[in-house]
Amino acid sequence: MVAKPVIFVVSDSVGETADLVTRAALSQWGQRSVEIRRFPMIDDPQSLREVIDAARQQPTLIVYTIIVPEIRKELQRLVDMWDIPAVDIMGPMLDGISRLLGAPEKLEPGRIHRLDDDYFRRIEAVEFAVKYDDGKDPRGFLRADAVLIGVSRSSKTPVSMYLAHRRYKVANLPLVPEVSLPKELFLVPPHKVVGLRVSPEKLHQIREERIKTIGLRSDANYSSMERILQELDYAESVFKKVGCAVIDVTNKAVEETAVRVLEIINRGVNFGD
């Protein structure tokens, strides 16, 4: 049996920067199955050797953000020795900026993630997105920077989490014909509500993949075109009733949709595209 490919995210801090870059790059390959394993706080030679030993056991790419020069050089030596592919995320950037400014970097792992007010705002936003995901508690709509509405599998949750990592508090609500709309939705200023629209064909494809993943029958009503059209018609009626802007997410990446959401809520305007 061929071993599953894996990416080791290695850092002498928390590893978030390397993890985000890795996931952004992986998105170019769609749904390919690649495991990501994060190894934070690798700041001594022994810990580093343990990571390398694990990487040698299977097809592995090492992606790393190592600030301390001695640890970075040792990692480079080990991956060269064992012929393990590796990508240095921070090294070339640090060297380039150092040459530009004519001054060395401060060499403080985790400096970018210091526990300042900005960091805590992001944590708070992520917790908010989790708590008010999928319409769990509509009371959160009134505290949100944005409320995303749309049918199931229209990328509401991924966009909410993406914006949360940029310190925006985002709630979302699935639109289901059989479920009444919460009164709180109509108390939110319309420019803070954003509808997510997706084509029937794309939604059918996404839902077919979803039911395969969770083991439902392929003829489940959830992915039938008749049901999809019914839900999309209902969603359009809700968009009009609320008076919100609408984004067509059919061919948009999560990042693109998030940018459009910010344009809408920051300008305070209602318009569709």
From Swiss-Prot:
Which superkingdom heads the taxonomic lineage of this protein's source? Bacteria
State the UniProt keywords alphabetically. Kinase, Nucleotide-binding, Serine/threonine-protein kinase, Transferase
Entry EC no(s): 2.7.11.32, 2.7.4.27
Q: What class of enzyme is it?
A: transferase
Q: Which GO terms describe its molecular function?
A: ADP binding; ATP binding; phosphotransferase activity, phosphate group as acceptor; protein serine/threonine kinase activity
Kindly state which reaction or reactions the protein catalyses: N(tele)-phospho-L-histidyl/L-threonyl-[pyruvate, phosphate dikinase] + ADP = N(tele)-phospho-L-histidyl/O-phospho-L-threonyl-[pyruvate, phosphate dikinase] + AMP + H(+); N(tele)-phospho-L-histidyl/O-phospho-L-threonyl-[pyruvate, phosphate dikinase] + phosphate + H(+) = N(tele)-phospho-L-histidyl/L-threonyl-[pyruvate, phosphate dikinase] + diphosphate
- Per UniProt, ADP binds at G150, V151, S152, R153, S154, S155, K156, T157
**InterPro entries to which the protein is assigned, alphabetical:** Kinase-pyrophosphorylase, PPDK_reg
Residue stretches in coiled coil: none
Family designation: Belongs to the pyruvate, phosphate/water dikinase regulatory protein family. PDRP subfamily.
Q: What does this protein do?
A: Bifunctional serine/threonine kinase and phosphorylase involved in the regulation of the pyruvate, phosphate dikinase (PPDK) by catalyzing its phosphorylation/dephosphorylation.
Under the heading HAMAP family, the entry gives: PDRP
Name of protein? Putative pyruvate, phosphate dikinase regulatory protein
